[in-house]
Amino acid sequence: MARQFFVGGNFKANGTKQQITSIIDNLNKADLPKDVEVVICPPALYLGLAVEQNKQPTVAIGAQNVFDKSCGAFTGETCASQILDVGASWTLTGHSERRTIIKESDEFIAEKTKFALDTGVKVILCIGETLEERKGGVTLDVCARQLDAVSKIVSDWSNIVVAYEPVWAIGTGLAATPEDAEETHKGIRAHLAKSIGAEQAEKTRILYGGSVNGKNAKDFKDKANVDGFLVGGASLKPEFVDIIKSRL
């Protein structure tokens, strides 16, 4: 089946008010394809600014993180209801930097994912293996474990987009070959078919992330199981528009 092409931009802990405004102004001026869904995730401090500045109907705003409970005494956290309150509609969960640096577990990420969905926030769920795990031949085992934590407590995946990000390729300049990505995505979809059912698995979009840029994005064009990209550093640059247009 044809799944709508999806491009996410994760700004990480980058940007100032002026830079965020400039990035969004560049998107506003671009002739973006009407059939490509775009979500940009600025730092939490700039979510409201991004919502106000964005004029593109195909571009939505997302958070980079969300807590697994409603608002309360959780210093430093971002609640799902607050994401919606400022006009954003998506959040990332499970990014490898939070798994490794913040030590978030599969189970905690699953709880955050479920709470966001239950609150009405759509989720880009990040999964992926380290270089050691890849060399050990357990890429799909790792991805399956990370996915299973979520599928155990979430049955409806209609508002989840999966982002496969091999940890060794994030911000390193190294990227999985299109063939490697397609093979892994195919395996991820096959696993999802077992855990959430073939129909949902077929509809779930699976993005590739890991040193995607304006030049290599086109190389993935004919890969049937690569439904888009989650872009890091390049989302801060004008070439982000080229990535959005890479299926044209």
Curated annotation (Swiss-Prot):
InterPro entries: Aldolase_TIM, TIM_sf, TrioseP_Isoase_bac/euk, Triosephosphate_isomerase, Triosephosphate_isomerase_AS. Its main location: cytoplasm. Its EC number is 5.3.1.1. It is an enzyme of class 5 (isomerase). GO terms for molecular function: triose-phosphate isomerase activity. One of its GO terms (cellular component) is cell surface. SUPFAM superfamilies: Triosephosphate isomerase (TIM). It comes from the Eukaryota. It is found in: Cytoplasm. The active site is at 95 (electrophile), 165 (proton acceptor). It catalyses: D-glyceraldehyde 3-phosphate = dihydroxyacetone phosphate. Keywords: Cytoplasm, Gluconeogenesis, Glycolysis, Isomerase. CDD domains: TIM (cd00311). Substrate binds at residues 10, 12. Coiled coil: none annotated. Pathway: Carbohydrate biosynthesis; gluconeogenesis; Carbohydrate degradation; glycolysis; D-glyceraldehyde 3-phosphate from glycerone phosphate: step 1/1. GO terms for biological process: canonical glycolysis; cellular response to starvation; filamentous growth; filamentous growth of a population of unicellular organisms in response to biotic stimulus; filamentous growth of a population of unicellular organisms in response to starvation; gluconeogenesis; glyceraldehyde-3-phosphate biosynthetic process; glycerol catabolic process. Belongs to the triosephosphate isomerase family. Has antigenic properties. Critical for growth. Homodimer. PANTHER family: TRIOSEPHOSPHATE ISOMERASE (PTHR21139:SF41). This is Triosephosphate isomerase. It comes from Candida albicans (strain SC5314 / ATCC MYA-2876) (Yeast).
